């Protein structure tokens, strides 16, 4: 979205809609009809917990090994921390020689994994979004 210069994203509806809406439009919410969080709500919460309230376009970390089909977007948080959003349908590994410490977040699972290395970091790339945070 940074490449397309979007400023905002709008949600269609916060919660699922009742039978007054068409069948097609009843289940778009982040919450179900009883206001219980759906998995997408939890993933979005985890995503926003890591990204913070605002992001500026940034550069992804320097890499000397990347899997095929990698989607890679660099950001900088308001506090100056750098973020790398990435995934690849093929999966694989990414080697980041310029990093010695970082934290890897999986917003879908809600996990965070500290990473350290003396010759850079090797990160397993999955087909789902992951976020790497470093200074």
Q: Language-model features: where?
A:
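Solvent-exposed beta-hairpin/edge-strand motifs
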Residues: 98-112
């Amino acid at each position: 979205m940074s490449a397309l210069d979007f400023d905002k994203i709008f949600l269609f509806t916060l919660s699922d809609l009742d039978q007054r809406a068409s069948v097609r439009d009843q289940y778009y919410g982040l919450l179900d009809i009883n206001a219980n969080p759906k998995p997408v709500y939890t993933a979005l919460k985890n995503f926003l917990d890591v990204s913070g309230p605002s992001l500026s376009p940034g550069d992804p970390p320097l890499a000397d090994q990347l899997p095929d089909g990698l989607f890679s977007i660099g950001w900088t948080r308001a506090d100056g921390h750098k973020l790398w959003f990435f995934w690849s349908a093929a999966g694989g590994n990414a080697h980041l020689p310029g990093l010695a410490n970082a934290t890897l977040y999986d917003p879908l699972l809600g996990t965070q994994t500290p990473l350290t290395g003396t010759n850079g970091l090797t990160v397993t790339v999955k087909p789902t979004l992951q976020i790497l945070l470093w200074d």
